[in-house]
Amino acid sequence: MATALPRTLGELQLYRILQKANLLSYFDAFIQQGGDDVQQLCEAGEEEFLEIMALVGMASKPLHVRRLQKALRDWVTNPGLFNQPLTSLPVSSIPIYKLPEGSPTWLGISCNSYERSSSAREPHLKVPKCAATTCVQSLGQGKSEVGSLALQSVSESRLWQGHHTTESEHSLSPADLGSPASPKESSEALDAAAALSVAECVERMAPTLPKSDLNEVKELLKNNKKLAKMIGHIFEMSDEDPHKEEEIRKYSAIYGRFDSKRKDGKHLTLHELTVNEAAAQLCVKDNALLTRRDELFALARQVSREVTYKYTYRTTRLKCGERDELSPKRIKMEDGFPDFQESVPTLFQQARAKSEELAGLSSQAEKGMAKQMELLCAQAGYERLQQERRLMAGLYRQSSGEQSPDGGLPSDGSDGQGERPLNLRIPSVQNRQPHHFVVDGELSRLYSNEVKSHSSESLGILKDYPHSAFTLEKKVIKTEPEDSR
């Protein structure tokens, strides 16, 4: 996976350290977690350092951690090894990606800027002398060789390279960086493009701000002597006074104010610089915000959120040659939650579709169970029917044996009726009918209603047999006329 190029000086320092430790594969992980402050890595305690290592995925590789620790120690003791003696430079405030590739300038500074005198009024920032070939050629043979930092072309290696030409270092003032006017006590400020974005956002927000009553402000200052002593003179200055803006910037700063207990050498980040600039611009529009720092801080953060994203996206697209393109993402809104409201119908439709799918699956399962029960019942009924048929066949054979002429009926001579005529023998045959009806009643009680349709045929055979026998006998028997004696 290709490693992204550093875009700020803080990222460049991290890039050089990881390059020294041969750990460039972790560069993207550090940037994604916001680890572009090398000083934070150096000052972190044991627990904090291990937590950072876990965030970037290095905790499971102790040898990589040791290599990084060694590179950090080398960076602290001998930063010259990394070509980065940038101890007094704002780490995250100067974007590098504004430079087009192959440009002989660095952050809008021409090669001649490095030859300026070091006796300027403003505090100076030291920059490394990593020379580009175009800069060296433009200077001439008689001048001292001085370099500037430049990107290599895309076809070559993506590494940041440069070479030292002399041991001396030239100075660079904030004015050379294109930063707007700022108090002389501070060397940290936004560049002109970011400050312009802040001013535009404040101009859009100014009409929506509530108007402050000057009498209320004066009453507040009268009751608060300490606050009046600090900022009371600002309200007495006229708008044409050139020192009024400087005083407003001095007392409106949210981060790194002159009376704060910030550690020496701890530089402001890009977010903090943006918030300070927004607070200053807001206080210039409405001086009364100096007395309401809570409200000022909230408004400045709102401006910073909008400006930071838009400015970062704009400068990134400028590097790719796509200018004046609007941001494709939606800026976070303070008033409502439209994204949540739009997602509710979608979630409802998804839940409804899932419920319909579950209902369909449950109906299929019920149908399958019903079919299985039907098959089991059919099998049980078939087995019961077979048993009934076997039983009926046995009863039928038994009844047939009793009615057979060979030995099924008892002889008439045994009853002493051998001399009687045939018509007198009929009652003896009819006396046997209740026996068959008793058998029929017992069979009907043996079986359930489920198999009546199947057993009716067998029972019908058993019922009809004796009646048919009686009918045949009646046809054969001829009654004799009584003797007329």
UniProtKB/Swiss-Prot annotation:
Pfam family name, one: SAM_NCD1
Record-listed Phosphoserine modification sites: S171, S182, S327, S404
Glycyl lysine isopeptide (Lys-Gly) (interchain with G-Cter in SUMO1) cross-link, renumbered residues: K332, K478
Subcellular location: Nucleus
One GO term (biological process): negative regulation of DNA-templated transcription
GO CC annotations on file: nucleus
Keywords: Isopeptide bond, Nucleus, Phosphoprotein, Repressor, Transcription, Transcription regulation, Ubl conjugation
Superkingdom of the organism of origin: Eukaryota
Record location of the Glycyl lysine isopeptide (Lys-Gly) (interchain with G-Cter in SUMO2) cross-link: K126, K129, K143, K211, K332, K354, K367, K371, K452, K463, K475, K478
Keyword Plastid on entry: no
Bias-annotated ranges (Low complexity): 403-414
Domain note: The NAB conserved domain 1 (NCD1) interacts with EGR1 inhibitory domain and mediates multimerization.
Family: Belongs to the NAB family.
Quaternary structure, from the entry: Homomultimers may associate with EGR1 bound to DNA.
Protein name in the entry: NGFI-A-binding protein 1
Gene this protein is translated from: Nab1
